[in-house]
Amino acid sequence: MSVERTLMLVKPDAVRRNLEGKIIAHVQEKGFKLVALKKLKLTKEQAQQFYIVHKDRPFYDELCEFMSSGPIVAMVWEGENAISRIREIMGATNPEEAEEGTLRKLYGTNVGENAVHGSDSPESAKVEIPFFFSRLEIVE
């Protein structure tokens, strides 16, 4: 096992419903350390840049529109196998298919408004974390 860092976003749908505290507590209760946190609102251009890997997918425009529709909470979590374990905690992309007790099952409403985003690989985390946080903003 290795200690990893991963990015997690609380999406606008969950922020609108004031769920960020519950989501943070849920992840902390699983033993992860929160090493960076900020609330911000992406412009559509920033959302397009962040999700550039999906630019050829049919949902890209809708995703970018949604992610720039309201505030988000960006976080960096640290822990053993954080990337895969936090993805398990988040659950399947579609809340209807997510396991009971996962964040998306608890707080997602549909495949687009599914409450959270998380890095899907070490390579993604290396790109996604610095998109939102400078080294000075990540507390050891």
Swiss-Prot record:
Catalytic site positions: 117
Location within or outside the cell: Cytoplasm
GO BP: CTP biosynthetic process; GTP biosynthetic process; UTP biosynthetic process
Binding locations of ATP: 11, 59, 87, 93, 104, 114
Catalytic activity: a 2'-deoxyribonucleoside 5'-diphosphate + ATP = a 2'-deoxyribonucleoside 5'-triphosphate + ADP; a ribonucleoside 5'-diphosphate + ATP = a ribonucleoside 5'-triphosphate + ADP
Source domain of life: Bacteria
Positions of transmembrane segments: none
Enzyme Commission code: 2.7.4.6
InterPro entries per the UniProt record, alphabetical: NDK-like_dom, NDK-like_dom_sf, Nucleoside_diP_kinase, Nucleoside_diP_kinase_AS
Keyword Protease carried by entry: no
Cofactor annotation: Mg(2+)
Keywords recorded for this protein, A-Z: ATP-binding, Cytoplasm, Kinase, Magnesium, Metal-binding, Nucleotide metabolism, Nucleotide-binding, Phosphoprotein, Transferase
Cellular component aspect of the GO annotation: cytoplasm
PROSITE patterns: NDPK, NDPK_LIKE
Record-level Gene Ontology MF annotations: ATP binding; metal ion binding; nucleoside diphosphate kinase activity
Main location: cytoplasm
Enzyme class, UniProt record, top EC level: transferase
Annotated HAMAP family: NDP_kinase (MF_00451)
Role summary: Major role in the synthesis of nucleoside triphosphates other than ATP. The ATP gamma phosphate is transferred to the NDP beta phosphate via a ping-pong mechanism, using a phosphorylated active-site intermediate.
Subunit structure: Homotetramer.
PANTHER family according to UniProt: NUCLEOSIDE DIPHOSPHATE KINASE
Family in the record: Belongs to the NDK family.
Protein name per UniProt: Nucleoside diphosphate kinase
Organism: Persephonella marina (strain DSM 14350 / EX-H1)
